Amino acid sequence: MTTEPGYLSPSVAVATSMPKRGVGAAVLIVPVVSTGEEDRPGAVVASAEPFLRADTVAEIEAGLRALDATGASDQVHRLAVPSLPVGSVLTVGLGKPRREWPADTIRCAAGVAARALNSSEAVITTLAELPGDGICSATVEGLILGSYRFSAFRSDKTAPKDAGLRKITVLCCAKDAKKRALHGAAVATAVATARDLVNTPPSHLFPAEFAKRAKTLSESVGLDVEVIDEKALKKAGYGGVIGVGQGSSRPPRLVRLIHRGSRLAKNPQKAKKVALVGKGITFDTGGISIKPAASMHHMTSDMGGAAAVIATVTLAARLRLPIDVIATVPMAENMPSATAQRPGDVLTQYGGTTVEVLNTDAEGRLILADAIVRACEDKPDYLIETSTLTGAQTVALGTRIPGVMGSDEFRDRVAAISQRVGENGWPMPLPDDLKDDLKSTVADLANVSGQRFAGMLVAGVFLREFVAESVDWAHIDVAGPAYNTGSAWGYTPKGATGVPTRTMFAVLEDIAKNG
């Protein structure tokens, strides 16, 4: 059994014609669309030329008719096609035909197909030849993310018998297909690594171990790493991290990961600097303000923001982004004990702001506040932070749509990019009047309001108090989207999703390109 993080990605190759040999065990994934005939619904192959002969296409479509296939979105069928050298054909429905396809539609279709592969270790696909922007990379991302599995803690008796998807061959004639395919593989591998971290149970991923794994992952791609232990945190005045972590026998950490990408830029002096901050609560009982027992086990995911930040900064180094990226990741375990902070305690955050802790279950904002102040000391141009911040996010937006708060212009930029990459972040306001709800009679701020309304926005207003005025800032609340408690869908498995790794990395790419 292995419990180390770091996803072993399938190999990815690009071909301009159907391989003729050595693919007898492979599955060919072919997209199909509905015919649009209401009285006689059927399915036809969506992308074939120049990879499939007309008689092969006819053979596939005949098999689909025999199965009463309709080409509906996410519908899959397995066919034997003797004229092809592959073991079988797997068709995946895209719904109605389009002139151009949204990348996330193809990403989802690839994920659906990958989840239907069962024991197949090698796939070939014509999905990437469909018209649309970003289709090749989306195809690879969907296949890798859809085939993701986490079995590190299963015994030999219950572990899956197959090795999982190990080889992907993308059929595509575009000149830059290989570059785009490898980019998609790198992004998906980073997301899968974040998933591995989140899926690792808190018995094995506590703050010191989390810091160790972050260090190992980061050093493998050449990042500078600093790990600050509990003694140094206390001495430096990180009151939020220490306060949240003091109830646990497993002390907190703060990790700093630095990608010095400006030296890769054509003009290093003009290269932007981006700070990333992610909440790393390795397990959240709620502390003295304890959570209900029924769903508490899902709080293994309360470090999803930190996992995504670690995955993002390591991906920035791996793909050599020409900007500086500095990640500040606070890590703590929120436990009830004789040493835990109490409702009514006052702590002093890093930087000097005092906070009255009215609810120990609103702990994420306390460790984030410390990290935000430290991150702003680096004088970044932009700050992106993410966390499973509030249950109110799921009330407002559900379990699939992150809430994006922050500086108006940058918030909108982050949300638009999130929607483009398929993580569907939605911009949320931060009304100034909500600050009145955070007034304390004994400290500078209270950590919660006395209202039951606008919980996500109140948390965002709290965090805004710690962001330097000169910094463009966005917070991505992924309380629901970071962890899927329902059934798998598209390229999203049950359990950790890796959201918002793709959003943050796409924002970094956009900043590297456009400033």
From Swiss-Prot:
GO biological process: proteolysis
Enzyme class: hydrolase
Main location class: cytoplasm
Positions of Mn(2+) 1 binding: 284, 361, 363
Cofactor: Mn(2+)
Keyword set includes Protease: yes
Reaction(s) catalysed (UniProt annotation): Release of an N-terminal amino acid, Xaa-|-Yaa-, in which Xaa is preferably Leu, but may be other amino acids including Pro although not Arg or Lys, and Yaa may be Pro. Amino acid amides and methyl esters are also readily hydrolyzed, but rates on arylamides are exceedingly low; Release of an N-terminal amino acid, preferentially leucine, but not glutamic or aspartic acids
Gene Ontology CC terms, in alphabetical order: cytoplasm; peptidoglycan-based cell wall; plasma membrane
Protein name: Probable cytosol aminopeptidase
